[in-house]
Amino acid sequence: MVMPVSPEPETSLCCAFCGRVLDVVVVNPTGELIGCEECAGERGLAGEVMTIEEWNAPAAVAEVLEQFGLSGWQAQKPAPSPAQQPRAHYWEVQSPGARYFLKRFYNWYPPASIRYMHSVMAHLANRRLPVPQWVPNSATGESFTEAAGANWALYRALDGRTATRQDWMWGRPKAAEMLASLHLELQDCLPEGEEFHPWGAWTLDTVDRVLESWQPHPDLPPELLGHVRDRLATRYFGELYPALPKLVVHGDYVAANILWKGDSMSATVSGVLDFERAHLDTALFDFAWGLGDRRPPLLRATIATYSRVRPLSAIEREAMPEALLLGALMGIDMQMTYFSDMDEVSRLAQELALMVRDTESLRKAAALK
């Protein structure tokens, strides 16, 4: 049964930690539900406080769907999954004979960047890859609309589920093949609009600025960070990066943005979501961010499945260990700066240290045999 936008008492939102019914919610910087204020505070999780009315936004949703020409619809927040909680800016929408999802963009994400991501998605959809197709505004034909002080987009929903951590381990080869297919088709993509520059390609200046902004952490000693910074400065940005092929990349090719069909052992990718971070970069960025692994056997296997669709060049293979180091810094920065999750920072810092230790083993794993 699909519930209406305004939840009935029996479907009231509850805190995942303490179970209490919520009249005020806390969401993380990506809009994902954390829980009540007390539980978020106890766990040191930073977030935005919203009322239930702001969370459901029934009047705004109704106004937006009218602009997209929908009638007889019902809307609800997506149900929790093993991969993620409901989000403040997503709704599932059912209308006669069709299913959609509705997205409200944050005000800091500009219209030119919405056009950019929608241009990338349209390019891939025209190449018959499984990405959401946006629905045009019924009056203007634009790929998004403005209402209630924000920009909104409506997409035709794709079937599938997100993977659990265990399913992701089994599915990584298939995910690598799909990423390679995306990269093949994006090599000639010239998007309209502008990429969102804060989420653009990292440079050495970005690395320096990020490292200077971090608070001291016991698992991130200066000598570790200094070694990584120097390695990136000389080996990656100095020697390899200028010669690496550049193309439009997805930007956030992680488990939460990939849909699957079938059981764990035979699952296939049925959808790739969330192109907000699409930008011009190296293919290694997507690979290192979403599929990179510090364990040489797993890295070798993932590279092999990717390369069956889009063979990695010799210089891409040579640069893989440094790309993994850069991706590790990005992951730490996200947890340090946006989520303030120091437990996850500790875990990722330990992974970084092991990656530094095993750099040459990773280089051998990436090399063409």
List each language-model region with its residue ranges:
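A cross-family kinase active-site recognition segment
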Residues: R165-E223, K246
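Active-site activation/catalytic loop segments of kinase-like enzymes and analogous catalytic loops
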Residues: L280-P311, L326-D343
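ATP/Mg2+ or Mg2+-diphosphate-binding catalytic cores
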Residues: A201, D205, S213-W214, G331-K369
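ATP-binding pocket architecture of kinase catalytic cores
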Residues: S95-P191
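Short metal-binding segments enriched for Cys and/or His
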Residues: A40-M50
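Active-site acidic catalytic loop and adjacent metal/ATP-binding pocket
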Residues: Q84-G97, F101-L102, W134, A233-F285
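Conserved NTP-binding catalytic cores of kinases and kinase-like/nucleotidyltransferase enzymes
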Residues: V49-S138, G262-A267, L368-K369
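Short linker/helix segments within small regulatory modules
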Residues: V24-I34
